[in-house]
């Protein structure tokens, strides 16, 4: 495997941040995507996961495989109904009319691209550290469990730590540092406010909005305690994109995720009966919303999480910026019975995020769904 290096520092030098990142076992050694003329065996993925064998759906005339588009500009009953329909039938949708300006989205995308264009040693100064949780540049810990590597670079950080975190990348705290941090802070502020607006629409769609409604207190508590994480992805162009995966098929574990993607399409949602992948178009100004597992639990299965993956392009790089929203670690996510089950019974056990992640981690590499493991057994199941 070829290691990405800058012209200024040897990767074998003790002073090289890239060498230090490799030595600490947290950040993987990075393949030089830019100079790749072929795909090395370490990145050949196609067909490894059973979901990867599902075909990619072609656009059909009746729009049956067109990803739903929700316009929230009016915030009216029609928009709420569209949110409910998309979350029930797809688990993901394109969001327009959200109020975040195209200029603001362009600024944050440009800054993400500039980060990934830095020399490898500069990026490696921000490498994930032992005991540093899920923060830093490099491969997220859960991806290291796959036998193959993804065709991607990534950087994860909690919004409150933006300025401290990126002083590692730009230790001189110069103009580049301030421009980057300002763009990320603007993105955080916009997504946080948008998340609260969308949460209100979700609860209204469930018929649980308002302080006097069955879910009113829950909505207020969730809104006031939402936690967030930003993950920047770069999916470089690839000489043989059909043999690699940008990001393996998965569901998000939290409540819901906003994804800003560049105009180059690459995100795909899994549809069933029959299984097929549907590509989300790169619609300028739109954000993608993906429902997560814990929102699936909270809504008692009415709004379902969706498997999604990222594929790469032969000619163009692709930027993707997920903004993850979820509960605090100590909050028990309890199904809102009135939201989903016609029998008015909880379909899932109440669970904290760490408890749920422990179940997911235990089932990694199997075909068993973590949601199925916290499902409350029906009476007929108990008797069989």
From Swiss-Prot:
The keyword Oxidoreductase applies. This is Gibberellin 3-beta-dioxygenase 1. 2-oxoglutarate binds at residues 318, 320. One of its GO terms (biological process) is gibberellin metabolic process. It catalyses: gibberellin A20 + 2-oxoglutarate + O2 = gibberellin A1 + succinate + CO2. It comes from Oryza sativa subsp. japonica. SUPFAM superfamilies: Clavaminate synthase-like. The keyword Iron applies. Binds 1 Fe(2+) ion per subunit.
């Amino acid at each position: 495997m070829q290691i990405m290096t800058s012209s200024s520092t040897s990767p074998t030098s003790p002073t090289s941040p890239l060498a230090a990142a490799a030595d600490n076992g947290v950040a993987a050694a990075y393949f030089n995507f830019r100079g790749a003329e072929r795909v090395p065996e370490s990145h050949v993925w196609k067909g490894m996961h059973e979901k990867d064998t599902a075909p990619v759906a072609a656009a059909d005339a009746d729009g049956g495989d067109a990803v739903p588009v929700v316009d929230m500009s009016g915030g009216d009953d029609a928009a709420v109904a569209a949110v409910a329909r998309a979350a029930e039938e797809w688990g993901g949708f394109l969001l327009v009319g959200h109020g975040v300006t195209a200029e603001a989205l362009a600024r944050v995308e440009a800054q993400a691209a500039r980060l990934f264009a830095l020399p490898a040693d500069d990026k490696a100064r921000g490498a994930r550290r032992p005991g540093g949780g899920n923060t830093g540049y490099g491969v997220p810990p859960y991806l290291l469990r796959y036998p193959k590597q993804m065709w991607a670079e990534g950087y994860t950080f909690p919004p409150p730590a933006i300025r401290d975190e990126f002083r590692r990348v730009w230790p001189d705290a110069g103009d580049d540092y301030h421009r980057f941090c300002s763009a990320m802070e603007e993105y955080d502020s916009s997504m946080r406010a948008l998340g609260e607006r969308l949460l209100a629409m979700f609860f209204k769609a469930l018929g649980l909005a308002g302080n006097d409604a069955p879910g009113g207190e829950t909505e207020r508590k969730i809104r006031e305690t939402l936690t967030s994480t930003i993950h920047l992805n770069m999916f470089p162009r690839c000489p043989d994109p059909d043999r690699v995966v940008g990001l393996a098929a998965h569901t998000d574990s939290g409540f819901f995720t906003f994804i800003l993607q560049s105009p180059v399409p690459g995100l795909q949602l899994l549809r069933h009966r029959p299984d097929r992948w549907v590509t989300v178009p790169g619609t300028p100004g739109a954000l993608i919303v993906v429902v997560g597992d814990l929102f699936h639990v909270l809504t008692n299965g009415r709004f379902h999480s969706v498997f999604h993956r990222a594929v790469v392009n032969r000619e163009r790089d692709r930027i993707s910026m997920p903004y993850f929203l979820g509960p605090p670690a100590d909050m028990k996510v309890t199904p809102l019975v009135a939201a989903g089950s016609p029998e008015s019974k909880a379909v899932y056990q109440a669970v904290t995020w760490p408890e749920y992640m422990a179940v997911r981690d235990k089932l990694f590499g199997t075909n068993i769904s973590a949601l199925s493991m916290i499902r409350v057994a029906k009476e007929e199941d108990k008797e069989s």
